[in-house]
Amino acid sequence: MQIQCKTLTFTVSSIPCNPKLPFPSSLTLRSWNPSFPSFRSSAVSGPKSSLKLNRFLRNCASTNQELVVDGETGNGSISELQGDAANGSISPVEVEAEVEEVKVDDLATQSIWGQMKEIVMFTGPAAGLWLCGPLMSLIDTAVIGQGSSLELAALGPATVICDYLCYTFMFLSVATSNLVATSLARQDKDEVQHQISILLFIGLACGVTMMVLTRLFGSWALTAFTGVKNADIVPAANKYVQIRGLAWPAVLIGWVAQSASLGMKDSWGPLKALAVASAINGVGDVVLCTFLGYGIAGAAWATMVSQVVAAYMMMDALNKKGYSAFSFCVPSPSELLTIFGLAAPVFITMMSKVLFYTLLVYFATSMGTNIIAAHQVMLQIYTMSTVWGEPLSQTAQSFMPELLFGINRNLPKARVLLKSLVIIGATLGIVVGTIGTAVPWLFPGIFTRDKVVTSEMHKVIIPYFLALSITPSTHSLEGTLLAGRDLRYISLSMTGCLAVAGLLLMLLSNGGFGLRGCWYALVGFQWARFSLSLFRLLSRDGVLYSEDTSRYAEKVKAA
């Protein structure tokens, strides 16, 4: 759709002059360059317009004065056709503007198949970002599993300390993307740099704190987590945790830099950094564990080095965009309040997920070394598979706000877009669920050679598939709730899911259902999230049907 300026002629008449002014004056207007958001970046794309803008004089015009705004060819000028020069009228000021052509590529105007094609193309690079982290853990699991079942079991509680705790700092990622994107929309580069510097400082402070806490209390936390019955796996797990803990500052700073790039609509830079990091981790695991025999310590060193390299590459990518990624700024109390107030609902949501998966590992840990090892393998494959649905949540958060709160608000089109996301999510769930189930069922030797561990893995195949297949659709629904700023509901519903599923997990584990009971509790957790999100979106009071946006307006403004 091409949008161009048209000639506009209007007459200003019968406007009384202000008697307090020393002279009657003409009305001089400033040319207006409309901004139409494209679906990709919600900003005008194309060459920058060069405007010579005159000042807008808020005085009165003389009687029967006609103004013409001419814009036939894209250059606009304002001229005075009739006026009384003897009365001291200000001579017209010519305004020349090179008005750019705005190409509107609106996702909402496409057919449902066209929408799905665009969504798939958009989520490609984003999928890579979500895959690299779980891929590193999966590589560690596969390499360590070939050497020792004891170290494979130790990897379970160790990854809880190293990986799951990282997700509690997801609020840094959300706050960075939101604040950077908002500052860019204002075209204020200094404000963008200030926001990045503040969040880099917060990331550094949190990272150093976690590194110190890991060093001081890592062994105690692992002992309390695994229990007395599994004290034999604590030394190996602690070795892994202490080495990985050295990378805490780099991990959180890297998250801030990655999210800043995403806020600038750049997903390829972070993807390249994480691809290099994954390659370093894979090669390091093979060399240090397989050839040099360092075992779980070698896997930890390979992962730690890869995380530091990834953080440096992401910061370097920011520097190439003209921002200083090595500039840190201490935030004021009001700025801290803004950041944490914005990210609090997401923090609660992520904490609920982390706590439930931590409970899964906790109850599995009490069932013996072989069951811990089997659970570790299945959980790593599950995590690797579920991230394929995360880009659907990101897509909803990118494209839904314009249809829900934008100038061209259109709830029917928003519902059609959600339908496209759910269809893709359901299809992706079946495909990923089938492939993700086939790998541990047909090729368990990739992860372990222990027949007992393999047997325990096969016992949870059915609940594993049921939990995995619904996850992508759940992500698309929750992403829509986040886009609609229905933050209170999503945080409360996730907390409720945690409470009910946690109780079910405890009952099934203590009732003698073993590892299978743990995974059926996960099925209940995932399907409850899907059902509650779907119910809210189909409700007449939900963001897709309610015409009253006053409940969400303040949240959108604050964000």
From Swiss-Prot:
Entry-linked Pfam families: MatE
Keyword DNA-binding set for record: no
GO cellular component: chloroplast; chloroplast envelope; chloroplast membrane
Annotated GO MF terms: antiporter activity; xenobiotic transmembrane transporter activity
Tissue localization of expression: Constitutively expressed in all green tissues.
Transmembrane segments: 119-139, 152-172, 198-218, 245-265, 273-293, 295-315, 336-356, 359-379, 423-443, 460-480, 489-509, 519-539
Topological relation to the membrane, as annotated: Multi-pass membrane protein
Residues in the signal sequence: none
Broad class of where this protein is predominantly found: plastid
Span of the transit peptide along the chain: 1-60
Subcellular location: Plastid, Chloroplast membrane
Keyword Transmembrane helix: yes
Keyword tags: Chloroplast, Membrane, Plastid, Transit peptide, Transmembrane, Transmembrane helix, Transport
Family note: Belongs to the multi antimicrobial extrusion (MATE) (TC 2.A.66.1) family.
Listed name of the protein: Protein DETOXIFICATION 46, chloroplastic
Lineage per the UniProt record: Eukaryota, Viridiplantae, Streptophyta, Embryophyta, Tracheophyta
